[in-house]
C-alpha cells in the first residue's frame, strides 16, 4: 500500500496512505476474529450508508463502484435470511436480516446529488455535525473496495459455515472453527495482495493533493507547477458551463447584426462601421466577470444559490415576481437556442425547418438521460460541444483580414452609430443574462460540502476567479472573432444589410470566404444551440427548485417547457421564418431589461455581513459595483428611449412606455430597500 503512494511528495499524503491501511487492517481484524464473525450482529446497511456519506471519490468512481455495490444489497439480505434458517439449531442468529435497500439507495442519491458536478480537491468529507470525527485517523478517507471486501469475506464465511453444518452435523463446531481460521488466513492474504496489486487500488490520487489544508497553505511556494495546474483543473466545471451563455445563438445573432453595420456614406474607401460596437463586447464581458465572481463567492460561502436566498429572505409576492421574470429570461434564451439548432440542421443536412424543430424534443430526452445518469457526464458533453464551437469560429481568424489598428480604436473609443441604439442594447443583453448568475451560484454552492475552513474557502474563491476569468476571456475572444468576420465582408452596393440574418448568414460566408466557411459556421451554430439548450434546462432546474423549494421530475419539467416553446416557435414559422431574426433581437432587449432581477439581489447579498461575513464587498468595490448596476439600468432605459425617438411612434406606444418606465424604476427602488434580516453565514 505504501509503495503505491510513493509518487506523493508531501508528508500529509504519506500520512493519508498509512492511515487508510491501518484503518482497514484494524477493521478486518475485528470483523474476522475467529468465530465471532457469525455471532456479531453487524448491520450491513450501516456499513454501506456510512461509506456512501464519507466517500471521497469523484462522480465517475461513484457510478462505477458504489452504485453497483449498493444495488447488490438485496443479495446480501437473501443470504442473511438463509443463514438465520440454518443457524437456528445452534442459537446463532444474525440480527436484522432484512437490509433496508431503499434507505441505502436514498443515502447514495443524497451523497451523489450533494457533490455532483464538482471535482474533488480536498476530499468530499461530510461537514455536518453528526459526521464530525474527532480522531484524525478516523477522519481519513474510507476505501470502498476494502469495505466491500469485508462484506464479501463475511458472506464467504457464512456460506462455508452453512455447508459445514449440512455435511458434518456431528462435528459442526470444530468444522466452523477450522473454516473460520482458514478464511481469516485467506482474508489476510487477500489484504496483502491488495496492497501489492496497484491495479486493484481504488483510491484515485489524481483528485486529491493533500488532505491537510494548513500544510498546503504553509508549503504553497514549494508546490510544483504541475500540482498547481492540477488543482486548477480539478476545480474547473461551473465557470465553463456558465460561459456557454456567452456563446448562445442570441449572441451569434447580435454579433452578426453588429458586424454587418454599414455607413450610409457611399464614398468611403473602406467601411469599418462593423467595428464600432466592439467596445460593448469587451466591456460587457468585463462586467460579466465581476458578477460571475460575486456569484461564485456567494455559492462558496453560504452553500446556497441565489434563488434559494431570494426565496428565504424576500416575501412571497416579491419572490414570485422575481421568479416569473427570471423564468421569462430563461425561456427567451431557450427559444434562441432552439432557433439556432434547427437553423444549423437545415443548413447542414437540408432538413426542412418545420421538421428540424422536432429534433429539440429528441434533445430533451438526451438531456433528461444525462442529468439522471450523471451531471459529471453532462459537463463532459457540454465541454466537448464548447470545444467544437471554439474551434469552428477560431478557424475563421485565418480567413479574415483584420485591421488591428481599427480594432484597438473601436475598443478604446466608445461610439454608437446613428440609429443603431437598439443593436447596442441587444448586444449587451446577449452578453449578460439574468439567469446565468442564478445558475453559477447553484453550481458553486455544491462545492460547500468539501470546504471545511476559511483557508480552503479562500483557495476555492481564488480557483473560481481564475476559472471565470479564463472562460470569459475565451468567450470574449470568440465573440469578437465572429463580429470581425462579418465586419470584413464586402457587401455590394445593391445589397442591404437587412437581407442577412441567421438563416442567410451562410451566404455571406460562402461569398466572402468560400464554401468550407459555410459549413464551419453551420457546425458552430449547431454546437452553440445544443450547448445553450442544455444550459437553459440546467438553469431552469436551479431556479425552479430554489424559488419553489420543491423538486420536479426532470422528464416532466423538460418536456413541459419544450412543448410550450415548441408551440410558440411553430406559430412563428407558419407566418414567416424570417421573423425569427427579429424575435431573437427582441429577446436580447428583454434580457438586458431583466438583468437587474439578478444583479440587484446579488449585490444586496454580497455587501451584507449576515450573508458573506468577512468575504463581503467593502468600501471601494462596494461603491464601484453599485455604480455599475445603476449605469446598466440607466443605459437600458436611455437606449430604449433613443430607439423610439428615431422611429415614428403613436401616442399609445409612448403612453405604455411611460407606464413601463415608472413600474420598472419603482420596483427597482423597492428592491434596493428590502431589508435583509436573516443570518446565512456558515462559519467554518
Swiss-Prot record:
User: What residue intervals traverse the membrane?
Assistant: 229-247, 276-299, 320-345, 351-370, 382-404, 424-445, 466-487, 516-534, 555-573, 585-603, 623-645, 651-673
Q: Where is the composition biased (Low complexity)?
A: 156-191
Its annotated compartments are: Vacuole membrane
The entry's cellular-component GO terms read: membrane; plasma membrane; vacuolar membrane
Q: Which reaction does it catalyse?
A: Fe(2+)(in) = Fe(2+)(out)
Q: Which Pfam families match?
A: Nramp
Q: Which residues lie on this side of the membrane: Cytoplasmic?
A: 1-228, 300-319, 371-381, 446-465, 535-554, 604-622, 674-684
Query: Which InterPro entries has this protein been placed in?
Result: NRAMP_fam
Any single GO BP term: iron ion transmembrane transport
In alphabetical order, the GO MF annotations are:
cadmium ion transmembrane transporter activity; manganese ion transmembrane transporter activity
Q: Which UniProt keywords apply?
A: Ion transport, Iron, Iron transport, Membrane, Transmembrane, Transmembrane helix, Transport, Vacuole
Give the bilayer topology.
Multi-pass membrane protein
**Induction info:** Expression is modulated by the levels of iron ions in the environment.
Q: What happens when the gene is disrupted?
A: Repeated attempts to generate a knockout failed. Conditional knockdown results in rapid parasite death. Impaired apicoplast biogenesis. Impaired mitochondrial polarization.
Region of interest called Disordered, as start-end residue ranges on this chain: 153-195
Where is it chiefly localized?
A: membrane
Q: Which residues lie on this side of the membrane: Vacuolar?
A: 248-275, 346-350, 405-423, 488-515, 574-584, 646-650
Stated role: Iron transporter. Required for parasite development during the blood stages. Required for apicoplast biogenesis. Required for mitochondrial polarization.
- Cite any additional comment in the entry: Exogenous supplementation with non-toxic concentrations of iron or other metals does not rescue parasites with stringent gene knockout. Culture supplementation with Fe(2+), but not other metals, nearly fully rescues parasites with partial gene knockout.
Family (UniProt): Belongs to the NRAMP (TC 2.A.55) family.
Name the chain's protein.
Divalent metal transporter 1
Native species? Plasmodium falciparum (isolate 3D7)
Q: What is the lineage of its organism?
A: Eukaryota, Sar, Alveolata, Apicomplexa, Aconoidasida
The gene for this chain is FVRT1
Amino acid at each position: 500500500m505504501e509503495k503505491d503512494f510513493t509518487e506523493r511528495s508531501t508528508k500529509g499524503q504519506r500520512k493519508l496512505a498509512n492511515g487508510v491501511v491501518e484503518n482497514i487492517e484494524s477493521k478486518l481484524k475485528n470483523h474476522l476474529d475467529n468465530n465471532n464473525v457469525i455471532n456479531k450482529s453487524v448491520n450491513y446497511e450501516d456499513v454501506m450508508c456510512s461509506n456512501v456519506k464519507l466517500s471521497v471519490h469523484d462522480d465517475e468512481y461513484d457510478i462505477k463502484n458504489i452504485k453497483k455495490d449498493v444495488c447488490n444489497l438485496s443479495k446480501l439480505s437473501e443470504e442473511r435470511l438463509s443463514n438465520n434458517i440454518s443457524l437456528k439449531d445452534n442459537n446463532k442468529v444474525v440480527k436484522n436480516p432484512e437490509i433496508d435497500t431503499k434507505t441505502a439507495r436514498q443515502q447514495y442519491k443524497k451523497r451523489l446529488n450533494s457533490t455532483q458536478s464538482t471535482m474533488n480537491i480536498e476530499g468530499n468529507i461530510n461537514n455536518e455535525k453528526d459526521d464530525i470525527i474527532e480522531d484524525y485517523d478516523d477522519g481519513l478517507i474510507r476505501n470502498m473496495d476494502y469495505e466491500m471486501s469485508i462484506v464479501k469475506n463475511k458472506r464467504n464465511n457464512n456460506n462455508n459455515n452453512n455447508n459445514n453444518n449440512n455435511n458434518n452435523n456431528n462435528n459442526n463446531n470444530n468444522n466452523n472453527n477450522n473454516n473460520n481460521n482458514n478464511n481469516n488466513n485467506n482474508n489476510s492474504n487477500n489484504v496483502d495482495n491488495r496492497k501489492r496489486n496497484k491495479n486493484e487500488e481504488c483510491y484515485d490520487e489524481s483528485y486529491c493533493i493533500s488532505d491537510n489544508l494548513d500544510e498546503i497553505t504553509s508549503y504553497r511556494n514549494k508546490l510544483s507547477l504541475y500540482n498547481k495546474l492540477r488543482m486548477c483543473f480539478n476545480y474547473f466545471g461551473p465557470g465553463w458551463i456558465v460561459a456557454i451563455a456567452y456563446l448562445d445563438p442570441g449572441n451569434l445573432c447580435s454579433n452578426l447584426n453588429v458586424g454587418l453595420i454599414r455607413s450610409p456614406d457611399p464614398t468611403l474607401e473602406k467601411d469599418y462601421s462593423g467595428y464600432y460596437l466592439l467596445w460593448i463586447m469587451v466591456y460587457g464581458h468585463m462586467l460579466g466577470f465581476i458578477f460571475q465572481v460575486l456569484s461564485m463567492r456567494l455559492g462558496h460561502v453560504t452553500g446556497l444559490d441565489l434563488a434559494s436566498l431570494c426565496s428565504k429572505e424576500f416575501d412571497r409576492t416579491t419572490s414570485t415576481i422575481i421568479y416569473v421574470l427570471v423564468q421569462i429570461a430563461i425561456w427567451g434564451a431557450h427559444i434562441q437556442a432552439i432557433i439556432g439548432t434547427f437553423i444549423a440542421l437545415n443548413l447542414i443536412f437540408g432538413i426542412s425547418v418545420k421538421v428540424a424543430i422536432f429534433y429539440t424534443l429528441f434533445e430533451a430526452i438526451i438531456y433528461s438521460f444525462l442529468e439522471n445518469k450523471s451531471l459529471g457526464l453532462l459537463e463532459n458533453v457540454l465541454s466537448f460541444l464548447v470545444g467544437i464551437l471554439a474551434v469552428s469560429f477560431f478557424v475563421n481568424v485565418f480567413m479574415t483580414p483584420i485591421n488591428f489598428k481599427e480594432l484597438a480604436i473601436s475598443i478604446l473609443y466608445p461610439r454608437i452609430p446613428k440609429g443603431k441604439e437598439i443593436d447596442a442594447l441587444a448586444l449587451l443583453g446577449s452578453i449578460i443574462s439574468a439567469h446565468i448568475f442564478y445558475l453559477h451560484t447553484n453550481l458553486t454552492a455544491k462545492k460547500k460540502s468539501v470546504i471545511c475552513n476559511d483557508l480552503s474557502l479562500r483557495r476555492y474563491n481564488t480557483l473560481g476567479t481564475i476559472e471565470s476569468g479564463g472562460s470569459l476571456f475565451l468567450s470574449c475572444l470568440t465573440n469578437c472573432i465572429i463580429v470581425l468576420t462579418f465586419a470584413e465582408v464586402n457587401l455590394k452596393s445593391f445589397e442591404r444589410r437587412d437581407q442577412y440574418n441567421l438563416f442567410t448568414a451562410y451566404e455571406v460566408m460562402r461569398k466572402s470566404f468560400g464554401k468550407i466557411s459555410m459549413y464551419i459556421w453551420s457546425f458552430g451554430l449547431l454546437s452553440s444551440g445544443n450547448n445553450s439548450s442544455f444550459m437553459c434546462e440546467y438553469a431552469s432546474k436551479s431556479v425552479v427548485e430554489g424559488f419553489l423549494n420543491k423538486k420536479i421530475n426532470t422528464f416532466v419539467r423538460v418536456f413541459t417547457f419544450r412543448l410550450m416553446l415548441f408551440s410558440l416557435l411553430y406559430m412563428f414559422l407558419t407566418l414567416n421564418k424570417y421573423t425569427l431574426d427579429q424575435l431573437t433581437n427582441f429577446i436580447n432587449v428583454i434580457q438586458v431589461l431583466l438583468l437587474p432581477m439578478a444583479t440587484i439581489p446579488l449585490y444586496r447579498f454580497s455587501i451584507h455581513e449576515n450573508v458573506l461575513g468577512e468575504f463581503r464587498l467593502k468600501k471601494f468595490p462596494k461603491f464601484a459595483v453599485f455604480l455599475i448596476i445603476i449605469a446598466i439600468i440607466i443605459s437600458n432605459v436611455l437606449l430604449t428611449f433613443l430607439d423610439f425617438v428615431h422611429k415614428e411612434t403613436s401616442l399609445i406606444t409612448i403612453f405604455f412606455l411611460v407606464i413601463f418606465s415608472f413600474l420598472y424604476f419603482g420596483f427597482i427602488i423597492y428592491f434596493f430597500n428590502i431589508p435583509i434580516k436573516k443570518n446565512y453565514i456558515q462559519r467554518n
